[in-house]
Curated annotation (Swiss-Prot):
Name under which the protein is recorded: Small ribosomal subunit protein uS8
Function: One of the primary rRNA binding proteins, it binds directly to 16S rRNA central domain where it helps coordinate assembly of the platform of the 30S subunit.
Keyword NADP: no
Superkingdom to which the source organism belongs: Bacteria
Record keyword Ribonucleoprotein present: yes
Organism name: Cronobacter sakazakii (strain ATCC BAA-894) (Enterobacter sakazakii)
Membrane-spanning ranges: none
InterPro entries named in the record: Ribosomal_uS8, Ribosomal_uS8_CS, Ribosomal_uS8_sf
Length: 130
């Protein structure tokens, strides 16, 4: 049985790992997951990430905590395999009035909603992180 939505699985592993106060979570790696992890690291939601293994690469995310509380308060999948959500540059949402981020897959790669607005790009909204 193959996994239907690997990105939702990644987000769930992050959510569950932080709820259980884990230091790190591992998952099967892909280019899109690495790109999402890179955005989360740049925005300060995770400490670090690394890819290990040649035949079956594993992505390991080091989770981030501040004063014993998880940095990621909520992480929510938006576009899913059964219902893709695309937005034009003018329609890009602001998560929690700008306090959170929307991770967006554009023609220039995966980036935050702020970066997409500055670049004048729309795309598929992968998830909201706050």
């Amino acid at each position: 049985m193959s996994m239907q939505d690997p990105i939702a699985d990644m987000l769930t592993r992050i959510r569950n790992g932080q709820a259980a106060n884990k230091a790190a979570v591992t998952m099967p790696s892909s280019k899109l997951k690495v790109a999402i992890a890179n955005v989360l690291k740049e925005e300060g939601f995770i400490e670090d990430f690394k890819v290990e293994g040649d035949t079956k690469p594993e992505l390991e995310l080091t989770l981030k905590y501040f004063q014993g509380k998880a940095v990621v308060e909520s992480i929510q999948r938006v576009s899913r395999p059964g219902l893709r959500i695309y937005k034009k540059k003018d329609e890009l949402p602001k998560v929690m009035a700008g306090l959170g981020i929307a991770v967006i897959s554009t023609s220039k790669g995966v980036m935050t909603d702020r970066a997409a607005r500055q670049a004048g790009l729309g795309g598929e909204i992968i998830c909201y992180v706050a």
